[in-house]
Structures are given as structure tokens and as C-alpha cells.
Regions:
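A compositional/biophysical signature of low hydrophobicity enriched in polar/charged and small residues
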Residues: 1-157
Length: 157
């Protein structure tokens, strides 16, 4: 599904789901978009089958859950291998996300959570054992997200 195929109703659905997918009913979204409940359900199904909506997940406060450390590990992998390494990196205990970067020398950003340094060190070692270079480690104090504003039909776009 190309961007030009996403209309204002799709954008409003995406915005609403980013706000609160767990509690946002198709009826709630229908009221926002001036469409029917069945239209919203069909649109959501289409967005899912087109893999624009890749899934639904909980926004976990790791600190409240007893894992106060969130580290960003900037890594360098060989360009031909970096994409193929992502599933293996995600299998490392403590890794919660991997991003493939396209500019700069560091081309993978690995996010790790843990209770203490002793949880983070084995992750860094596993990355080294895979042949990656860990170029930088950054401790994150807080992490907040917001729905993408261009999906909000009320912002004038």
C-alpha cells in the first residue's frame, strides 16, 4: 500500500490506534472519522494485511517493572550482514529493539534493558561475539512517544 493510497480516514485510524490501541474501539474511531463501525474494521483489516499496521504491543515502563537501566548500544556491522543479523540480535536476552541505521559508521542501534550493569555486559559481549563492534553506549534516563502528527486529521494536514 503506497502512501498515496492512505487517505484521511486511514490516517485518523492510525492516529487513534497510536494514541491507545487497547481501549480505542472501532465505534470510537468511527465517531472521530464520521464513518461506520464496519468501515473502520474493514480499513483496519486492510491496513494490517498491507503490513502498515505490523502489530500491537504494550508500552512498558521498564523502570516501574524493575528494570531501571535502558542502554542504547551503537554498533557497527558489515553492510551486507547488518540486516540479516537483526533477528539473531533480537534473540539476545535483554534486547528489546534493533534499528538499522543508514548514515554514519554505526549502522545498528540496539536497545537493551536490565536491572544492573551485570545484565548489560553479557549483551555487549554477545554482540562482540557476533562480530559487531560496539562503538558507543548511552544510558537513557527517559523515553516518551507520541502518535505521528501527520496522521491527526485535526492538525490541518
Amino acid at each position: 500500500m503506497a502512501d498515496e493510497e492512505i487517505d484521511d480516514v486511514d490516517r485518523a485510524i492510525l492516529y487513534a490506534l497510536q494514541e491507545d490501541a487497547r481501549n480505542m474501539s472501532s465505534g470510537d474511531i468511527a465517531a472521530r472519522t464520521d464513518t461506520s463501525d464496519s468501515t473502520v474494521r474493514k480499513r483496519i483489516n486492510h491496513l494490517e494485511s498491507s503490513e502498515i499496521i505490523k502489530g500491537y504491543s504494550a508500552d512498558v515502563d521498564y523502570q516501574q517493572a524493575g528494570y531501571p537501566l535502558r542502554m542504547l548500544l551503537y554498533c557497527t556491522a558489515s553492510i551486507p550482514e547488518r540486516g540479516d543479523l537483526i533477528p539473531e540480535i533480537l534473540d539476545i536476552d535483554g534486547v528489546v529493539s534493533v534499528q538499522e541505521l543508514v548514515t554514519g559508521e554505526e549502522n545498528l542501534l540496539v536497545t537493551v534493558v536490565g536491572e544492573s550493569d551485570s545484565d548489560i555486559t553479557p549483551v555487549a559481549q554477545a554482540l562482540l561475539d557476533m562480530g559487531l563492534t560496539v562503538a558507543d553506549e548511552v544510558l537513557v534516563r527517559s523515553h516518551e512517544t507520541t502518535p505521528f502528527g501527520k496522521f491527526d486529521s485535526g492538525n490541518g494536514t
